[in-house]
Amino acid sequence: MFLAGPETERLTHRAKTEADAAAFYALNSNSDVMKFTGDVGFESEEQAAQAIRDNPDFERYGFGRWGCYLKATGQLIGFSGLKYLPELDEVDLGYRFFPEFWGQGIATESALACVEFAFRSLELTSVIGLVLPENVASIRVLEKSGFQADGEIEPDGMRVLRFRVTAEV
């Protein structure tokens, strides 16, 4: 089980704990952050804490979406990581950061580290990224991280673009 994820020059990745609930709530109730996710934000800090407690991905699959922390301060600035999507039988890269960290290359730095982790540590052969067509910034992060367009799908009735990166053999 990989509770600790990759490290980069500026970032560490690890499983979120209940101590992160306030920041996790703030992230997932921010309308700018949630605009392109297709998710419903948290209504309370307790709901965020419950989501942290109830996350079975690390136990079930050995990996998940890690909290993403600045190395310099230890501050939770978002999350990034891998999630197995059983309905697609694919592993998806997802990330979400506070707006004050947008435009600094952090999402790309984190995405590249997570993809490398997927291929080296988990020995996956491909990873997908699902993104709403209007989320141009996220599409750019995926492209900078080596992903290529791989069609459109409609999980849960919502049209999304699928991007894919494959391991170099």
Language-model segments: residues:
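Acyl-donor (CoA/ACP) binding surface of acyl/acetyltransferases
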Residues: 1-36, 69-169
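A generic secondary-structure signal
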Residues: 54-55, 117
